[in-house]
């Protein structure tokens, strides 16, 4: 089965306003920049975006913030985006700041079909507000929900025509688990190779 499409605009054609998206990458590494550019061109809005970070002003998710296409961010680090800061302080953007390890596990849980889990991270802080608390082995833990997305956009090093992917170096941080947590995953690859080439190296 050939899962390759002509370009990023075709790949994202079924993404609509109001959907929840996961976008891979760690810092500025492994970001699906062509998919993000296509979303900017399409002009859809009211998006909920799940990403480790919010990009910078002129790259990554920063481009979608500039065009006011994001309604809510679920993220762990947002410190290098002045437009993000401006929108949050002006009450124009909803934000759910999640500890990085918790965000990673929420995404992994969503992809594995696990609806919720308990973690001690965040107990006794604002992170725990409104969440169920239980004690395990004398340690208080809060319940966190698994995360899913309507679509996930990832960036891979290599991919084949069947959709198998290999991620390289730091790009392996969030891309593979996000690929599992999206109902539909769209991957842009640096190199497209014939089926059977990747063999046992496949990550997803």
Residue ranges and their predicted role:
Residues 8, 24-26, 52-54, 76-78, ...:
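Fold-independent oxyanion-binding glycine-rich loops
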Residues 2-98:
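N-terminal active-site beta-alpha-beta segment that forms phosphate/nucleotide-binding
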Residues 28-34, 57-59, 161-170, 174-175, ...:
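Short glycine/serine/threonine-rich phosphate/pyrophosphate-binding segments
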Residues 71, 148-150, 183:
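Conserved acidic residues
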Residues 177-202:
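ATP/nucleoside-binding phosphotransfer catalytic cores, i.e., glycine-rich phosphate-binding loops
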Residues 152, 202-204:
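Conserved small/polar residues in nucleotide/adenosyl-binding loops
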Residues 91, 96-169:
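ATP/pyrophosphate-binding catalytic subdomain of soluble kinases
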Residues 61-62, 84-85, 108, 138-145, ...:
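A generic local secondary-structure boundary/capping motif
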């Amino acid at each position: 089965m050939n899962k390759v499409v002509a370009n990023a605009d075709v790949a994202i054609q079924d993404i609509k306003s109001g959907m929840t998206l996961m976008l891979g990458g760690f810092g500025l590494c492994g970001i699906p920049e062509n998919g993000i550019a296509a979303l900017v061109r399409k002009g859809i809005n009211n998006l909920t975006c799940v990403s480790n970070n919010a990009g910078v002003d002129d790259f990554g998710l920063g481009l979608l913030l500039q065009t006011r296409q994001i309604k809510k961010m679920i993220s762990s680090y947002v410190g290098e985006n002045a437009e993000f800061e401006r929108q949050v302080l002006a009450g124009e953007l909803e934000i759910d700041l999640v500890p990085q390890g918790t965000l990673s596990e929420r995404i992994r849980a969503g992809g594995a079909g696990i609806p919720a889990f308990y973690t001690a991270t965040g107990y006794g802080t604002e992170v725990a507000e409104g969440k169920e608390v239980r004690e395990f082995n004398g340690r208080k833990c809060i319940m966190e929900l698994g995360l899913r997305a309507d679509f996930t956009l990832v960036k891979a090093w290599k991919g084949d025509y069947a959709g198998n992917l290999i991620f390289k170096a730091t790009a392996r941080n969030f891309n593979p688990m996000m690929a599992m947590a999206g109902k539909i995953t769209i991957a842009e690859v640096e190199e497209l190779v014939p089926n059977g080439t990747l063999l046992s190296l496949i990550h997803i």
